[in-house]
């Protein structure tokens, strides 16, 4: 049939076909299919898929495709990536979807990075790490051996761990290698804090001392307490050292001169923790940038002015129970915005701007958890048998790690958390290094470390 004649015939057939009922149209199609050969059937098969199975990701504008993808969970999205190259390309290009998926896992997000494929890879890495935490496979352990008597003082900073012992020595360890960097002769150590040049120690001999790492020389000796010194902190910027003691007193010292500037009284129990920290919020009594002095005993947390006024008064006292029926656990967290402490009733979080209790986090499945570290996303907790990670958004325990029979001091000085940045959200790089350290009955130090990504 000539082309012109064919087009005329086709037009006539089309007019007639459109006048048929649906049933007649179906019968006509069935008859035509029965008359078709292999070439016609293959043509029909190829075109039916396009007509009947519309690929919305391929046909819709990219903005609408991204909007639809935001309603799917990440695991479904990963499955959809396997449908076709086109689907994989579109889904892997949706930055917001993968950033949100990472945020929901508690990972820190840099919004300036808009590379969708980067965030998809971060998500895949994140779910692997979260699976390891869930399956108790995210950590590994190690030991530091070198002391010959009990170790009751630990302090960690930037990959270095300081240990103070009753063997009259303090050692500085490189956690990554397990090697002792410095070892100096001291007095008995109940508390330690260090920087690159110096070590400050609080002792059971009722004094505080400052030592030089490089020479081991004692550069300053602070005398005045009448009980063991359980906690120390200092600021080079202020040239101030603070100490808390079993004599119920907090003392403020001139760091370089060694003279006592003030004695703060008001505690009726051992002062087990002192913290010198800059305020990050405008509070009722402080402005951002002001230095804050906190002290804690087994019942109360006190906030003090930093000055030289004699008989200066405590600015604020925080407690869990007015009748002292509930004790505070020894570890105290203060980051300039929030004060957090654990008790038998759970974790208490105070807003430093108002001193109000923001929330009480209870863990009914595990009682009497002690606080090690607290962040925006995670908290690190422990008891006599396990180390726990809590997701603070859901207040649920998402991981635990077994601990050996360690030496747990009532003051909280013989155990500590390591790197803390991951508590504000993992980012694929900060889940390295030390997680937890504690002294052992055999005088060694037990370390829990992040296992490298597999």
Swiss-Prot record:
SMART domains: FBOX, WD40. InterPro entries: F-box-like_dom_sf, F-box_dom, FBXW2, G-protein_beta_WD-40_rep, WD40/YVTN_repeat-like_dom_sf, WD40_repeat_CS, WD40_repeat_dom_sf, WD40_rpt. The modification N6-acetyllysine is found at residue 298. It comes from the Eukaryota. WD repeats lie at residues 146-183, 185-221, 224-265, 276-314. PROSITE patterns: FBOX, WD_REPEATS_1, WD_REPEATS_2, WD_REPEATS_REGION. SUPFAM superfamilies: F-box domain, WD40 repeat-like. GO terms for cellular component: cytoplasm. Residues 54-101 form the F-box domain. The keyword Nucleotide-binding does not apply. Keywords: Acetylation, Repeat, Ubl conjugation pathway, WD repeat. Directly interacts with SKP1 and CUL1. Substrate-recognition component of the SCF (SKP1-CUL1-F-box protein)-type E3 ubiquitin ligase complex. This is F-box/WD repeat-containing protein 2. It comes from Rattus norvegicus (Rat).
């Amino acid at each position: 049939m000539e082309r012109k004649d064919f087009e005329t015939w086709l037009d006539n057939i089309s007019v007639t076909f459109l006048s048929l009922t649906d049933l007649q149209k179906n019968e006509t199609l069935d008859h035509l299919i029965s008359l078709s050969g292999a070439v016609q059937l293959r043509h029909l098969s190829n075109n039916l898929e396009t007509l009947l199975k519309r690929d919305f990701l391929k046909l819709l504008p990219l903005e609408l495709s991204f909007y639809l993808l935001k309603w799917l969970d990440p695991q479904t999205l990963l499955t959809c990536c396997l449908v076709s190259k086109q689907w994989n390309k579109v889904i892997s290009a949706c930055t917001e979807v993968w950033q949100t998926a990472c945020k929901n896992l508690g990972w820190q997000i840099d919004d300036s990075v808009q590379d969708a494929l980067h965030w998809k890879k971060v998500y895949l890495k994140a779910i692997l790490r979260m699976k390891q935490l869930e399956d108790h496979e995210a950590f590994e352990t190690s030991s530091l051996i070198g002391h010959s008597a009990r170790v009751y003082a630990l302090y960690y900073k930037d990959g270095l761990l300081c240990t103070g012992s009753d063997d009259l020595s303090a050692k500085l360890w490189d956690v990554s290698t397990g090697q002792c960097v410095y070892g100096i002769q001291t007095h008995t150590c109940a508390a330690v804090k260090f920087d690159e040049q110096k070590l400050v120690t609080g002792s059971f001999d009722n004094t505080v001392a400052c030592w030089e790492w490089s020479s081991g020389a004692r550069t300053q000796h602070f005398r005045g307490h009448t009980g063991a010194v359980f906690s120390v902190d200092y600021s080079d910027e202020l040239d101030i050292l603070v100490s808390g003691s079993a004599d119920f007193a907090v003392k403020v010292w001139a760091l370089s001169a060694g003279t006592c500037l003030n004695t703060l009284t008001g505690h009726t129990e051992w002062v087990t923790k002192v913290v010198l920290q800059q305020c990050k919020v405008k509070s009722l009594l402080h402005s951002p940038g002001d230095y804050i002095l906190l002290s804690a005993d087994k019942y109360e947390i006190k906030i003090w002015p930093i000055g030289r006024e004699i008989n200066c008064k405590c600015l604020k006292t925080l407690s869990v129970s007015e009748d002292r029926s509930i004790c505070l656990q020894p570890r105290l967290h203060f980051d300039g915005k929030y004060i957090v402490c654990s008790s038998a009733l759970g974790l208490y979080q105070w807003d430093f701007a108002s001193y109000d209790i923001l929330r009480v986090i209870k863990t009914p499945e595990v009682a009497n958890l002690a606080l090690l570290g607290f962040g925006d996303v995670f908290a690190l907790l422990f008891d006599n048998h396990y180390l726990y990670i809590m997701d603070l958004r859901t207040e649920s325990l998402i991981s635990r790690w077994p601990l050996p029979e360690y030496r747990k001091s009532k003051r909280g000085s013989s155990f500590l958390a390591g790197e803390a940045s991951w508590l504000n959200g993992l980012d694929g790089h900060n889940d390295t290094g030390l997680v937890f350290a504690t002294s052992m009955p055999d005088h060694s130090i037990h370390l829990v470390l992040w296992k490298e990504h597999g």
